[in-house]
């Protein structure tokens, strides 16, 4: 699954640590997500989309 987490996170000026804290995960989880090494649960994907103020379909794609 491809994601645009880093793009939108940096656009908002949010660090990985800040996003992790707001989403309720460790910073390493955000690192793995951004590197494409981990696919989030639906709950985590929704939490991240909410914190980044981006519709989930703009944040994640199957291609």
Label each PLM-derived region with a short phrase.
Residues 1-4, 63:
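Absolute protein N-terminus
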Residues 3-21:
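Short basic helix-loop element that most often maps to the first helix and adjoining turn
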Residues 8, 22, 33, 62:
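Residues in the recognition helix of alpha-helical DNA-binding motifs
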Residues 11, 50, 61-63:
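Short, charged recognition helix plus adjacent turn
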Residues 17, 28, 57:
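Key DNA-contact positions within bacterial/archaeal DNA-binding proteins
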Residues 25-38:
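Recognition helix of helix-turn-helix/homeodomain-like DNA-binding domains
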Residues 43-58:
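DNA major-groove recognition helix of helix-turn-helix/homeodomain DNA-binding modules
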């Amino acid at each position: 699954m491809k994601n645009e987490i880093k793009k939108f996170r940096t656009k908002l000026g949010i660090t990985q640590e800040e996003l992790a804290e707001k989403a309720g995960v460790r910073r390493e989880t955000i690192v793995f997500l951004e590197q494409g090494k981990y696919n989030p649960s639906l709950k985590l994907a929704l939490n991240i989309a909410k914190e980044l103020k981006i519709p989930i379909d703009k944040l994640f794609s199957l291609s």
